[in-house]
């Protein structure tokens, strides 16, 4: 039989750890690169683009399509790093939490 008070303390501890992990993610910055660094995108932990840097060699009308592709790739690279870090942070917040049999988290 699971002690309800112990479970409640664990849940409160997990909630605090998850809140801390979310705050860390909100303050984190991720840099995605494409074209060997010709395009860089810096995104926040919330997935918002903060800055885009484009090498001047790509600022030619005939390079427009390639530039668009590189921006997309750089953004996706930054987002992937953000997603991986988010997953690791939340996994760490849940570490050590034992749930009663049959209890499932809402995610």
UniProtKB/Swiss-Prot annotation:
Oligomeric and partner information: Homodimer.
Organism the protein comes from: Rickettsia felis (strain ATCC VR-1525 / URRWXCal2) (Rickettsia azadi)
Molecular-function GO term, any one: DNA binding
Family: Belongs to the YbaB/EbfC family.
Matches recorded under InterPro entries: YbaB-like_sf, YbaB/EbfC
Pfam families according to UniProt: YbaB_DNA_bd (PF02575)
Localization: Cytoplasm, Nucleoid
Gene3D superfamilies xref list: Nucleoid-associated protein YbaB-like domain
GO CC annotations, alphabetized: bacterial nucleoid; cytosol
Full protein name: Nucleoid-associated protein RF_1365
Function: Binds to DNA and alters its conformation. May be involved in regulation of gene expression, nucleoid organization and DNA protection.
Keywords annotated in UniProt: Cytoplasm, DNA-binding
């Amino acid at each position: 039989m699971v002690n309800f008070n112990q479970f409640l303390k664990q849940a409160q501890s997990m909630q605090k750890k998850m809140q801390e992990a979310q705050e860390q993610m909100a303050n984190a910055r991720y840099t995605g690169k494409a074209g060997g660094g010709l395009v860089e995108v810096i995104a926040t932990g919330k997935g918002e683009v903060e800055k885009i840097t484009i090498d001047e060699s790509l600022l030619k009308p005939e390079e427009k399509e390639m530039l668009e592709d590189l921006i997309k790739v750089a953004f996706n690279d930054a987002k992937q790093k953000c997603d991986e870090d988010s997953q690791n942070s939340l996994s760490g917040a849940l570490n050590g939490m034992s749930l009663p049999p049959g209890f499932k988290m809402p995610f």
